[in-house]
Amino acid sequence: MSLLAMGKAAREASFELAVAATARKNQALLAMAEELELQQDVILAANAKDIEAGRSSGLTDAMLDRLLLNESRLAGIVADVRKVVTLDDPVGSEIDSRVLENGMRLSRRRVPIGVIGVIYEARPNVTIDIAALCLKTGNASILRGGRETFNSNMALVKVIQAALAKTGLPAASVQYIESPDRALVSELLTMDQYVDMIIPRGGANLHRLCKDQSTIPVIIGGFGVSHLYVDESADLIRAIDVIDNAKVQRPSACNSLDTLLLNEKIAAEIVPALVARMNQQKVTLVAEPKAFALLQAAGAEQLRAAGAEDFDTEWLSLTLGVKVVADVKAAIAHLQEHNACHSDAILTNDLKCAEYFINAAGSAAVYVNASTRFTDGAQFGLGAEVAVSTQKLHARGPMGLTELTSYKWIGQADYLSRS
């Protein structure tokens, strides 16, 4: 089937999905969860082929980690799908209403966006996340995954199609572009007669491509340097655990810590404990001169001087930038200079300092006394996410069900004519 034919089929499917009852959509999601469990061995075997091919082609450890599916991760995906079933369906809900002077009742009601195109790289879980959230919100989707995940995605798409068949929803509700031809990405980006929104999930190059070529509204997200600032009033003992969690728990995640900013008044005090923990976790520290001297004196085992672009780098690995700053205003100045748009945090016991950071940071998600790792649909109680938007229009942060809807105005009256 040509891409244009897929677009037309998706548009037609979106009309049926828009009026599908919540119970019917939930039935499809439950069938999807059951099929994932039934086909676990097939899915993991397909993923093993992708992992083997990835190693042979020289993929980084960070990319391989994103690509990996195992029993635990698959169980998490199943749980996320079932969580989506329990969430309220935003479609049809009334946002607000009022009665005008002429007697008309005017309201805004949530509706599906229509057809959503999603282009993503080495994350097979995205296939299920997108399908589940789009189905729940009555949106048709056209998916294009990376070649690194081809076998995994083919197995997952079969699961989705089986669930759609069981529940009688259109097969074109969720479609996957199987061809690795990159020209199809450019074609998808210009199919504005059928596709209403494009969501890229991948690196900066993918986002730039979509932004430059698309004639369809694009949700930019996922990429961004995440920072954590340790204020002079912070509990330095407890701070080490938060820094460790933000950097080490899953370094390949887009919400993992990239740059640590230390207030100059506590830098010398916290560095020994920081170095001990980072040495233990095999983290490479990349530091500007003040931080470098302190880290070197404390015995940092993997340490190098920061280059011109290091503080603009999303590491996605066990590497951490470290810088000493004068105060919270200097920390904010650093954030503003270095692409802080995703997840940023402050550790402080000073409420005024915390409030200043919250208001001044331009990030999609800002944390006080917490790890950056919480920027996630499941952690936010959204069930899953289609993306983490770092732009300011339409949606921001983890995009769950509500962010996959628009609204329409509804006027109800008694045979009213305009005077």
From Swiss-Prot:
Cellular component, GO annotation: cytoplasm
EC number: 1.2.1.41
Compartment(s): Cytoplasm
Keyword Nucleotide-binding assigned: no
EC supergroup of this enzyme: oxidoreductase
Pathway: Amino-acid biosynthesis; L-proline biosynthesis; L-glutamate 5-semialdehyde from L-glutamate: step 2/2
InterPro entries the record matches: Ald_DH/histidinol_DH, Ald_DH_C, Ald_DH_N, Aldehyde_DH_dom, Glu-5-SA_DH, GPR_dom
One annotated GO biological process: L-proline biosynthetic process
GO molecular function term, any single one: glutamate-5-semialdehyde dehydrogenase activity
Keywords from the named record: Amino-acid biosynthesis, Cytoplasm, NADP, Oxidoreductase, Proline biosynthesis
Stretches of the chain forming a coiled coil according to its record: none
Catalytic activity: L-glutamate 5-semialdehyde + phosphate + NADP(+) = L-glutamyl 5-phosphate + NADPH + H(+)
Role played: Catalyzes the NADPH-dependent reduction of L-glutamate 5-phosphate into L-glutamate 5-semialdehyde and phosphate. The product spontaneously undergoes cyclization to form 1-pyrroline-5-carboxylate.
HAMAP family: ProA (MF_00412)
Protein name: Gamma-glutamyl phosphate reductase
Species per Swiss-Prot/TrEMBL record: Tolumonas auensis (strain DSM 9187 / NBRC 110442 / TA 4)
